[in-house]
Amino acid sequence: ASAFAMKELGIKGLVFVPEATSSVKVNAIKNSGCEVRFHGEDGVDTENFARDYATKNNLTYLSPYNDFDVISGQGTCGFEIMDQLPDCDVISVSVGGGGLISGISSYAKFSNKALDIIGCQPSNSAVMAHSIDADEILDIESEPTHSDGTAGGIEKGAITFELCKQLIDRFELISENEIIMNLNNFIDNHRMLIEGAASVA
């Protein structure tokens, strides 16, 4: 999304991604005109490196989730859901760093306080779920997962941690077999190729 926005605004961008990022995602970023650089095995390593790089080179750093403007933008998804499905009583959202679910649930729960918000994470990388259980941001090593868009940890002091604690009613942890099954279901029954992170929810 950031790469697309930079292309639309004519802004030159540099996007850092973990080493294990899918080639499809990397190519999509490159096709938007941004330079892509790889660093680290985990999202937190990549974020910390990117933040330091931006500071040292006098660049603007944009977090993929730990930013109120980013979360507000993702809240428009919550608006669309409630606009199209005003009577829905449950919303499930894939969770990595927590930006998307923070944005969606902030608006959705404002519209309907009785709404159930379910955070969905791959069992192999459920850092937010385990951190909320422990009531602190944990530094947990993630296992490989088909859901690379939600993989990795959460940076210390992330604003999404408190938001997720307040807004998520429960978590569902999804196995790798379930992720693959959901991906195949979308291909077979809906003729849609979705990314692993989407199939988690």
PLM regions with names:
Residues 1-201:
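PLP-dependent amino-acid enzyme catalytic core
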